[in-house]
């Protein structure tokens, strides 16, 4: 059970980290993703070149597919929808909650109070 709770607590931070990494990679110019030229006769440089051959098209395709998401319209639409769904009537909801909480607390206090001390003095 504690492992499940730990996973639920770390999931938002993991998602935020992945989102941050995606933003960072998407904002990098393509030139910075190409490897710096090194000695061509080294085996590691051949491996690095082969990996970059495979990874670079994948990164480019992913960036092109998700470009719409990073545009201002997508972010603006998300913020507007979030506001309309969650924040638009926050003031009236908060006032109603405070009023009902106060009434509930007063009723609870009144029911716990002895009749002699909390008697309604207006009725006589």
From Swiss-Prot:
Residues 1-27 form the signal peptide. Its main location: secreted. GO terms for cellular component: high-density lipoprotein particle; very-low-density lipoprotein particle. Pfam families: APOC4. The keyword Secreted applies. It is found in: Secreted. Keywords: Lipid transport, Secreted, Signal, Transport. GO terms for biological process: lipid storage; lipid transport; positive regulation of triglyceride storage; triglyceride homeostasis. InterPro entries: APOC4. Belongs to the apolipoprotein C4 family. May participate in lipoprotein metabolism. This is Apolipoprotein C-IV.
């Amino acid at each position: 059970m504690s492992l499940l709770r730990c996973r639920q607590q770390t999931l938002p931070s993991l998602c935020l980290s992945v989102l941050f990494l995606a933003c960072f990679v998407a904002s990098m110019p393509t030139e910075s993703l190409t490897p710096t030229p090194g000695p061509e006769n080294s085996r590691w440089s051949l491996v690095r070149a082969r990996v970059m051959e495979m990874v670079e098209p994948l990164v480019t395709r992913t960036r092109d597919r998700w470009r719409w998401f990073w545009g201002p319209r997508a972010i603006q639409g998300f913020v507007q929808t979030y506001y309309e769904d969650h924040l638009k009537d926050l003031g009236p909801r908060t006032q109603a909650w405070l009023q009902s909480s106060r009434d509930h607390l007063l009723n609870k206090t009144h029911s716990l109070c002895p009749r002699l001390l909390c008697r309604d003095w207006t009725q006589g």
